[in-house]
Amino acid sequence: MSGTLLAFDFGTKSIGVAIGQRITGTARALPAIKAQDGTPDWNIIERLLKEWQPDEIIVGLPLNMDGTEQPLTARARKFANRIHGRFGVLVTLHDERLSTIEARSGLFEQGGYRALNKGKVDSASAVIILESYFEQGY
């Protein structure tokens, strides 16, 4: 086991991507993947899996602030199930509440409004999701 994890911040137009190491508990953003109504180019995901060979995939689970599910929750679950079904890799869903707000805030501090492009925000959110997963001791 390499201790490498790949995280996705699911969205209907863009899917953020991050790579991380369990041993260091750190993650970094990779380029976001464009999606058409939530469907990614599966060849890109396959290339990511071949390149990074993760032990586990983390998919952010969008929930309302009170913990209830929202319309995007079922779509994120379906995306996670498809990854597992297509590639046979362990996939874990992880609460992503506030990750996009935190990502936008951090990117704005670094570069103002110009830093807030959709792909950067989505991949920064994937970093936050993965680091949160590490912080919870997984």
From Swiss-Prot:
Localization per Swiss-Prot or TrEMBL: Cytoplasm
SUPFAM superfamilies linked to this entry: Ribonuclease H-like
GO terms classed as biological process: rRNA 5'-end processing
Keywords, sorted A to Z: Cytoplasm, Hydrolase, Nuclease, Ribosome biogenesis
Entry keyword Transferase: no
GO-annotated molecular function: nuclease activity
Origin: domain of life: Bacteria
Cross-referenced PANTHER family: POLYNUCLEOTIDYL TRANSFERASE, RIBONUCLEASE H-LIKE SUPERFAMILY PROTEIN
Function recorded in the entry: Could be a nuclease involved in processing of the 5'-end of pre-16S rRNA.
Protein name according to UniProt: Putative pre-16S rRNA nuclease
Naturally occurring in which organism (per UniProt): Citrobacter koseri (strain ATCC BAA-895 / CDC 4225-83 / SGSC4696)
Gene: yqgF
